[in-house]
């Protein structure tokens, strides 16, 4: 069970339904989310759900979806904020972890929903992402997150 990894990509969507935008760095604000993202302004599909400050997905999971289901997800279309590599996100539910200087706590798995399925219009995407759709987390201590930052359990 890998307990350290790296941020490989950062995406924010300025409003619900808008395409995600890739950024090199973003400010994470405790209890709010990532500046410039729909959830920061409480505008996302799950804005009323506890622990939707930031979402993460493993690059390894995306590679598995492509391998097992022949679905190639372009960067950011999965609508998760941070793409990581080298850390088992499913093991971070109810665990505090650090992304660079940001302290987070895993809240729940980010299982695929009908909203993602309809947004992508890709047959089988919901099934393909079950148990590998990533992690929802709350931000406990804010700071700037940048591509290349280390992700580690505390």
Q: For each predicted feature, which ranges?
A:
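Metal-cofactor-dependent catalytic cores
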Residues: 1-154
